Structures are given as C-alpha cells and as structure tokens.
Amino acid sequence: MKFFQEQIAIKETNILLKVDNPKFFKMAKNAVINERLNLENYILRNPIFLTSYSPLEVPDNAPKIVKLMAEAGFNADVGPMAAVAGTFSQLIVENLIENDCKNAISENGGDICLKCEMDTTVGLYAGNSSLSGNLGFKLKKEKMKNGYGICTSSGTVGHSVSFGNADSVTVFSKSAIIADAAATSIGNFAVGNAVDAMNNCLEKAETISKIDGVFVCMGEHAGKIGKIPQLIKTDKKEVLGNVFEMV
C-alpha cells in the first residue's frame, strides 16, 4: 500500500501525517486549525490552563479538546497541557476515520496516534542511548483497528517540560491523550542513578489507569511494565519526526 506524507506546522503544532490518500491532508489541516482555535480561545479566558502543573477542573461547557486534556491530566496527576501533543494527534486521526480514512498515522513531537490496516513498526528514539534506533515496537493491525496511542516523554531530548532525566518513557494506550499525560507524569519520576530512576518510573506507572504498558529507557538500562507490543531489532537510526515504518 502506498502512503502519502505531509508536515502540518501551525504555530507550536508540528505534525507529521501519513495517510493512504492525499485528499485527507486538507481535512487534517482544517482540524488542527479548528482545534487550536478552540484551545487558544479557552486559554485566553483561563490562562492557568496553560501553566498549571496540577490537574484542573473545567466546566461542562468547555470545548471537547479542553475536557479531554483535563481528563488525562487527572488520570496521570499532571497539568492538562501535558497531554496537548497527543490530543492533537488523536483528534486528527479520529477526524480522518470519521471521513472514511482507513490508514492514518499522526506523530506530534514523539506522540503518535495511528490507525492502520497492516502491521506497523514504531521505532524507539531515546536520544543518546545505545538502544535508540536499535529497537522497535511491532503493532498488530488488530490492535490499531480503532486507533492506538504511543507517546514518549524524555528528560534529555526535545523542548517539553520534564522533571526527570529519562532518555525515554514510552506509554501504550488506546488513547494517545491518556498516553501523553501518563508519559509526562512517569518521566517526572526519573531521578537518581539510572537503575533507581528506571524503577521509580515503573513504580509510578503502576499507579496510572487506562494504559496498557510502559517501556522506560535510561542510558544502557531498560525496563517495562504491563503489556507492550512485541520488541524487535531494527537498524534504523530514528530521529524525531521519522519514527514509524510499515512492515
């Protein structure tokens, strides 16, 4: 199957989108614009939503994107903006599915939502760790039939706020929104030496609901908890923005 790829960059949102028909790019861009407008307008009236590191209650009449982010924040005990990248990825894929798109992968700064009718490998990007580019997660098409989230937080790579120093904390969930907030929360516990930091992350992961599994990478050390996709060896030196391939 042929896939088409396009970068959608609007202000802070920078999404790499792969779809099976280029007609979906315009739909996706419009979805980003509309959801950003909803979020920005809410933040103008409620600026604490942008800066809070703690979960926030939001009113019932808040925009859908705001309520989803707030829910994910409470689930992982972090501020709602911890889920922003995964939220955009998921809302785009959901929008495309509603418009009969059969295969869509949205990656927003390491936070991925994908719906594919074929097995797909997602490569591990973990900064300077020797595991980066040498491991991948093989997702079965059955797992992705209704969309699936794979989100990564790092204390050593990227511009997102993390209070820990993990090379990567990758969370797997049916919801990319839930996974994004969870990855941030778990990554905040990556303190101490590599082994202690990894164990701290895995212990925190046990307390978070609605996630399938977690993979933590700390230098030459790695650990997992819960159910994660099959780990396979790869020879792709992954970089941010190029983290998936079809198999």
Curated annotation (Swiss-Prot):
Record-linked InterPro entries: ApbE-like_sf, MA1715-like, UPF0280
Domain of life (superkingdom): Archaea
Annotated NCBIfam families: PRK04334.1-1
Family statement: Belongs to the UPF0280 family.
Protein name according to UniProt: UPF0280 protein MmarC5_0355
Natural source organism: Methanococcus maripaludis (strain C5 / ATCC BAA-1333)
